[in-house]
Amino acid sequence: MDSRQYAENIAKKAKNTVRKLSSLTTKTKNDALLRTAELLLERKSQIIEENKKDLELAEKKGYSKALLDRLALDDKRINQMVQVLKDVAALPDPVGEIINMWTRPNGLKVGQMRVPLGVILIIYEARPNVTIEAASLCMKSSNAVILKGGSETINSNRILVDIIKQACRETCFPEEAVQFVDTTDREVVNHLLKLEGLIDVAIPRGGESLIRAVAENSKIPVIKHYKGVCNLYVDDEADMEKALNIAYNAKVQRPSVCNAIENLVVHKKIADKFLPEIAYYFGKAGVEMRCDEYSYNLLINHPKAKDTEIVPAKEEDYYEEFLDLIIAVKVVDSLDEAIDFIEKYGSHHSDAIVTENYTKGMKFIQDVDSAAVYINASTRFTDGNEFGLGAEMGISTDKIHARGPMALKELTIPKFIVFGNGQLRENVGIPKDESEIKIDTNACSL
């Protein structure tokens, strides 16, 4: 079987389960999720053994320590996957939920009901726990899923999918609703992305190059975010302690993720007080500060910044997703200038303001066009679990129905449902005699 046939085969298997999935009870779905959780614990030693194969191969290829860490599965991470499954099982089932209902003057009752997207292709890198997160969300939302993990985790992903399928068989959940691309042939992905009619949406999770490759080569809709250039603006009316802690948390707590800040924007009236203090703490954490002219001149010889690497910023630094202990600094004269800066250099992911001025905070929320906008809190909270949504499929910056963390509800779409009692458009029904027959021949008329 060549790569094209392979892709079509698994897509058709997934598509063939769509009608069956839509009629599953919540109990059946939860039973499958909870049985998967049990099997993860029962087969933990097998998971770790298969994961070691991936780690050994990755080490031979010279992968970085950071990547090796993302690949690794241990007792703690397996227990976290178990908890994800339990959490998703505990969430309300979105399928079939009526989200709107109204009555028209003619008596028609019109509403919207949540229904599954259909078949979801998720393409991801490095982290095998995504296999469990993605499958669990798709199963609970009655979507079929095609899982395409990275070649570096194929052994880990294979055993995890085998466990999911075992749970499906044991709980009467259609196991072919969970498909796994069990090959490292990259051409399979290219073929999958062309399968309009079989696959309804693709969701890439990984680096910018992967996401761009998927978006540029796909004929099916793609839900994505290219990168997370997140910004923190410290207003001249900011509480200093809040500003310092938020800036430190948003950059240092976990710098390699998409919701960490990359740009620190500071009002000039508070810059002389705030920047030396944050430079001191950034220095202790090993953060390099790439500064505009004003902040560079302020910090380069400042005693508070003596242990901090201070370098001049280049224009391209403000566009960069560093994913590292590096931050670009910009000093501005006004809130409007800060918002303009964020619009130009940000990626519409997550942006925050620190201010004690309510009016300024509300203007920031109104004017900053991002998936998540904060007042007096760290951008690190842009996450399905942190928002109380449960596990997530990823974070979308697209301007579609799914924006921000994509959890259960974002894996459904509304369908109009209409209840009538014999209503007719313009009361035109079967005529009593042929002379009453009237047909509107205007092709453009509705």
Curated annotation (Swiss-Prot):
Highest taxon, organism lineage: Bacteria
Biological process, per Gene Ontology: L-proline biosynthetic process
Keyword terms: Amino-acid biosynthesis, Cytoplasm, NADP, Oxidoreductase, Proline biosynthesis
Chemical reaction(s) catalysed: L-glutamate 5-semialdehyde + phosphate + NADP(+) = L-glutamyl 5-phosphate + NADPH + H(+)
Localization in the cell: Cytoplasm
Top EC class of this enzyme: oxidoreductase
Family designation: Belongs to the gamma-glutamyl phosphate reductase family.
Primary role: Catalyzes the NADPH-dependent reduction of L-glutamate 5-phosphate into L-glutamate 5-semialdehyde and phosphate. The product spontaneously undergoes cyclization to form 1-pyrroline-5-carboxylate.
Protein name, per record: Gamma-glutamyl phosphate reductase
Species of the source: Sulfurihydrogenibium sp. (strain YO3AOP1)
